[in-house]
């Protein structure tokens, strides 16, 4: 499980580091849990003008419906397969529930085919029903997760579905409890208060090797729907504020093509209600 480095037979393979896909156990998705998805081409419907740069084409894909709520309380589910999902960096797991229903969830590290997972709702937990074990794949409200546990797939509002920590290799950590809230350290280093009725899944999102992947050639980017990103300094003055000049010239403050300041310029619009729940801000360097 992980990545493989190609032999430098061609220029496209020289620096390529790709997935080995050894963790996958099934090639075709569960058809009842997918639907056709038309890629966003980044152009207007009427005139075909670019509305969002660097997008276009890409392979045909079907969207996988992921269960981000984990609301089937106390119904055990068996891991049937580990599958690829073109819409996210993480792998997904197909669960077969005891009542016959099938659902996809994100693949936690160390969860294998044949394992059993279970979740419990806040309502059932406060009634005194037995809590699931603290092991990868099980889900429960933050109130009942021990301090120090690594978690992912975290809700911000009870019952609204997970919004945080869903990418490959990521995890957050419960570091405290206080008056109806859990203190959670996010991958960015930010410490935030989250309602302890919110659901979270135990464990770390699988495929931590994702950050090592290098596509190696432009063609693989096009397969993923990514078009070339041309530097502003390589354009003409009519096309970009950085354009023009003799040779490779700089000497201007970094700007977008429309004159907006970039690189260090704060783009957040005012304060948000949720800012009051931030105990300490994220690290400037990104992940902890």
Curated annotation (Swiss-Prot):
Residues 232-265 are annotated as: Disordered. It comes from the Bacteria. Keywords: Ribonucleoprotein, Ribosomal protein, RNA-binding, rRNA-binding. The keyword Ribonucleoprotein applies. GO terms for biological process: cytoplasmic translation. PROSITE patterns: RIBOSOMAL_L2. Residues 239-255 have a biased composition (Basic and acidic residues). GO terms for cellular component: large ribosomal subunit. Part of the 50S ribosomal subunit. Forms a bridge to the 30S subunit in the 70S ribosome. Belongs to the universal ribosomal protein uL2 family. This is Large ribosomal subunit protein uL2. It comes from Hydrogenobaculum sp. (strain Y04AAS1). The gene is rplB.
């Amino acid at each position: 499980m992980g990545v493989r480095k190609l032999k430098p037979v061609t220029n496209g393979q020289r620096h390529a580091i790709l997935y080995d896909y050894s963790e996958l156990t099934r090639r075709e998705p569960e058809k009842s849990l997918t639907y056709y998805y038309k890629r966003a081409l980044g152009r207007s419907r009427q005139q075909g003008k670019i509305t969002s740069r660097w997008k276009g084409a890409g392979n045909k894909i079907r969207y996988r419906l992921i269960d981000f709520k984990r609301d089937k309380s106390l119904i055990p589910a068996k891991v049937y397969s580990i599958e690829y999902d073109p819409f996210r960096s993480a792998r997904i797991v197909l669960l077969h529930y005891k009542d016959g229903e099938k659902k996809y969830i994100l693949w936690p590290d160390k969860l294998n085919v044949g394992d059993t997972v279970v979740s419990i709702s806040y309502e059932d937990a406060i009634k005194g029903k037995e809590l699931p074990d603290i092991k990868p794949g099980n889900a429960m409200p933050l109130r009942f997760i021990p301090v120090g546990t690594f978690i992912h797939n975290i809700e911000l509002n009870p019952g609204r579905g997970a919004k945080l920590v869903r990418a490959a290799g990521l995890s957050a950590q419960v570091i405290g409890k206080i008056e109806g809230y859990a203190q959670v350290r996010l991958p960015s280093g930010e410490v935030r208060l989250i309602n302890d009725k919110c659901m979270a899944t135990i464990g770390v999102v699988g495929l931590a090797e994702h950050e090592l992947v290098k596509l190696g050639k432009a063609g693989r980017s096009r397969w993923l729907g990514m078009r070339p990103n041309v530097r502003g300094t390589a354009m003409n003055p009519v096309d970009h504020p950085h354009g023009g000049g003799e040779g490779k010239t700089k000497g201007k403050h970094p700007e977008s093509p429309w004159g907006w300041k970039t690189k260090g310029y704060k783009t957040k619009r005012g304060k948000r209600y949720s800012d009051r729940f931030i105990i300490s801000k994220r690290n400037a360097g990104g992940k902890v």
